[in-house]
Amino acid sequence: MADSVPGGHVLLAKNSDRPVSDTQPLRFLPRRTAQAGATLRLAHVEIDDVEESYAHLGGSPYWCWGHEEGLNEWGVAIGNEAMFTRDWADTVSAVKGGADRDGGILGMELLRLGLERGRTAREALDVICSLVDRYGQWGSGVVGQPPVTGGYDNSFLIADAQEAWVLETSGHRWAAKQVTTGTYAISNQPTIRTEWDRASGDLVEHAVDSGWWESAPGRPFDFARAYVDPGTPLQLSHIRLQRSRQLLGEAVGAGGVGLGQAQQVLRDHYEDTFLGGPYFNAALPDFLSLCMHSHPSDFTWGNTAGSAVFVLPKRGEGLAHLWWTPVTPCTGVYVPVFVDAGRVPGIFAAAGTAGVRACPPEHAPVDTYDEGSYWWRFRRLLDIVKGGESAWTFNENQSVVRRAFDALERQWTAELPQVEKDALALRERGEHTAMADFLAGYTESCAQQALEVLEHLVAQLSG
């Protein structure tokens, strides 16, 4: 979801839903350079590299070169969602029938390339659109699955301090809509209907030629209706999309969407609705919720693997940063992380026993617990809170976790304005190394506090 309030900061918030053991560390990637004519090998295709790629933070599945969410040194933030389209469905059908299909670029790779090559949200949009035009999207994005079961098209929220864009793609084609104020939410379905600001040149023609849209006098072309896969039930996405819209609208009506409101949206399981929340508890979900949990019957595809709120202030009004927590945000604590720090705590960037690598997901080893991984420490806490697959103890234990972690978030939220002020003062004096060290030290301090509270909770709830 994205929010832009006149006179306020742009916020972009994102939950990343992945298989239960798809470890998602948070890494800092410095600027890198490439020689003229160099190429870049991605999971399923080789593309042209560029001379200089920008530094950024990225939350990535442990096996993936690309990211589910990220923030670059210019204050551009991007999050993506899987989207199931007619182009995707036709390709799946053709491949199952024996056809060959060249690889394309994964949505997570497109996201990282946008961060590496875009100094503004609009530049990042241009980067992603040009790559979709040229290479398309095809390949597995899920560990252990081939493209026909692990592939998907993608939608993106792309924002900087000035503007935000919604980009929705289908194979080699796309439509984009600019967001200049207010709020916008996406889920795993197209949301752009009859109005957009930019699009592929043959967007309408392709749909008509494919038999997905019948032109008629006075009927405006509806991108979502034409391109959404009718074989993928919208129950997978529409309830979550509408819940996001409802919560954002309520927050706007109550004065605006701030950090706390964004975090609450990401932690939502339909509490305070006519559903009353899940029948038993969030760890035994009845529907796909915004904060997603795996179900013993596997009707959900995993857990939320990472969650972030990106804060994008105008220059001089603060520092672009994100509040990040691994695993399900309802059992996690959001820690402030600054791209200007030039690094993250080593434990943030660590996976489990498989380590961090870049390889096709079909070849990635299954990751398992390691004490040196911040992600796995929080995954272990989630398992303890649940008390087993039947999640008998989730409700009682989750309230204990929230009391402890909410206190930390309140503390850091109160401290952050002074932290930003002190960091900006160092930058104004040209002390960039000192500023980076100061910000990195602050995040390290927050991480250590979080781990101390986590270990206390583990001991308390395991007793």
Where are these regions (language model features)?
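Substrate-recognition/cap regions that form aromatic- and gly/pro-loop-enriched pockets
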Residues: 288-424
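Intrinsically disordered or highly flexible coil/loop and linker segments, enriched in small
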Residues: 120, 137-141, 275, 317
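Short, charged, surface-exposed loops that flank catalytic or proteolytic processing sites
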Residues: 117-125
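Short, conserved catalytic/metal-binding motifs centered on acidic residues
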Residues: 12, 124, 308
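Short, well-ordered beta-strand elements within core beta-sheets of diverse protein domains
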Residues: 111-117
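Histidine-centered catalytic/metal-binding microenvironments
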Residues: 399-463
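Accessory "access/gating" subregions that flank catalytic or transport cores
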Residues: 241-302, 309-311
